[in-house]
Amino acid sequence: MTVLTEKWADVLDLEGAPKIVDAHRRAVTAQLIENQVKAMKEDYAHGQFFTMLQEDAPVNHGGDGVAMGQAGTNAQMAGYDPVLINLVRRAMPQLIAFDVCGVQPMTMPTGLIFALRARYGKQDGQEALYNEADTGFGGDGFGQLGATHKGSNWADGGEYEVGSGMSTMDAETLGAGKDWGEMAMSIERTSVTAQTRALKAEYTMELAQDLKAVHGLDAENELSNILATEILSEINREIIRNIYITAEVGCESGTMEKGVFDLDVDADGRWSAEKYKGLLMRIEREANRIAQKTRRGRGNFIICSSDVASALQMAGMLDYAPALQNNLNVNEAQTTFAGILNGKYKVFVDPYQANGSANQYVVVGYKGSSAYDAGMFYCPYVPLQLVRAQDPNTFQPKIGFKTRYGIAFNPMVQVMAGVGTGSIKAKDIAGKNYYFRKFVIKNL
């Protein structure tokens, strides 16, 4: 348990809120609550908030939350805003970012993501420890790539040779007669800068009074929930769409058309269920391709339309209630998590794409167990900032929400795509992020 998770244990284990089981998700949520409180302290210190429309607290009371300062000192403003803390606690752990990309909270408005690359020769040489090792580089005494190691796939035919170690006589003349194989390393970095989303809402005091009297609802709380939900939904969609745009096109071979898997042409079966199993084999091939290109691991999650998820279920492969996983994070409100495919893929349904269409789709992606092992990173800074104000002419209340976060891509992906290591948009590496692969499904 980290210092922050221990500090905010009462909030993280809030009764009635979805339980946070994953240790990383707890740590990130704790850091975001800490960032939230820090931002609130600064806002209160600079007088950016008007009175919080709540009853006066007793003199020795530190507010509804944990006191920002000493109890009894400006008691009404000393407590953390329970609306914001509750929204952060309930909403942030539900973001799909935790399952499909790395989540690295920022403590400052700018940050850097680093990647170390091994090189053959000098720092600008060809990358090592990525594809197959050159069997002759350290053993033939030439100090060059491809001198004795040739060919990449023996099944394709053509020249295919292997390098070997050098003799004792040659080893004794290294540096004079024979050349040492030299290696180096370079450190790549990608910058990430916090960006902002902002929404506002206005209401009248008469509306607030009537809503309270008739329905027992607080107008400010209801509008706050609407604004916060919209902001977080927009972030979810931004993450999903970034994956769609940057994912590599799959179905490179074994299909009539690149990027398309036609169940009538590319799958053989007497019944639909047999063809659906052919679709599963295609998903397996795309996951294997991700492993070959990233050298990190096979694809382990899928984003698809609801029709594709139904097809996989009908094939008997999609388990909605895995016997060994009793704490699945199923967000029924957004209907995104569908289940576990073949015991190893998390399946997420995109409810807004391709439903009822003739062409369906699948995106296969990889996210490692570490927050640093992913093709894309979501970097929250200040989860939610609530601003209260009053119209100077009508004196009617207004509220505004802001959130600050950054989106960054794996620096290795950017370097391989040839776009540099600065802050980029998804369109700059469209179809080049090899941590994700996408293909269209026809005749489902």
Please name every model-derived segment.
Residues 1-138:
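Extended assembly-interface regions of large multimeric machines
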Residues 6, 14, 34, 55, ...:
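Generic detector of low-complexity/intrinsically disordered segments
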Residues 81-82, 89-91, 97-99, 161-165, ...:
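Sequence/fold signature of self-assembling virion shell proteins
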Residues 90-93, 103-106, 111-194:
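Assembly/oligomerization interface modules of large self-assembling protein complexes
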Residues 239-247, 251, 411:
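Structured alpha-helical bundle/scaffold domains in large eukaryotic membrane-trafficking regulators
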Residues 250-274:
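Acidic/histidine-rich catalytic neighborhood
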